UniProtKB/Swiss-Prot annotation:
Native species: Lactobacillus delbrueckii subsp. bulgaricus (strain ATCC BAA-365 / Lb-18)
InterPro entries: YbaB-like_sf, YbaB/EbfC
Lineage: Bacteria, Bacillati, Bacillota, Bacilli, Lactobacillales
Quaternary structure and interacting proteins, as annotated: Homodimer.
Subcellular location: Cytoplasm, Nucleoid
Assigned GO CC terms: bacterial nucleoid; cytosol
An MF annotation (GO) of this entry: DNA binding
Role noted for this protein: Binds to DNA and alters its conformation. May be involved in regulation of gene expression, nucleoid organization and DNA protection.
Protein name: Nucleoid-associated protein LBUL_1514
Family: Belongs to the YbaB/EbfC family.
Record keywords: Cytoplasm, DNA-binding
HAMAP family cross-referenced by the UniProt entry: DNA_YbaB_EbfC
Amino acid sequence: MSKRPAFPGMGGMNMQQMMKQAKKLQEQMAKEQENITTQEFTGKAADDMVVATFTGDRTLKSLFIKPEAIDPDDPDMLEDLVIDAVNKGLKQIDQATQQSLGKYTKGLM
């Protein structure tokens, strides 16, 4: 009997080797993701008038608002500052995730 041919373009790997490699890759990605979830990410708006701090799993950990940011005559301004700080914090998480996990997903899409 002839030896089963390896998958073309896979560097001569057989199915068992590919599965082993995929499992290793999955474990590395899980470790990277866990590392991100333990980090904190901060979004700031208008010279730190509003500061939103998140954990890497996108949980809002704290929201700091300077008293001078609270103007009873202009609640829309405070809303805008909170939205800006929150969006900046979430964007930092997205960027860190892309940077960390992007090396594994590059070429898959």
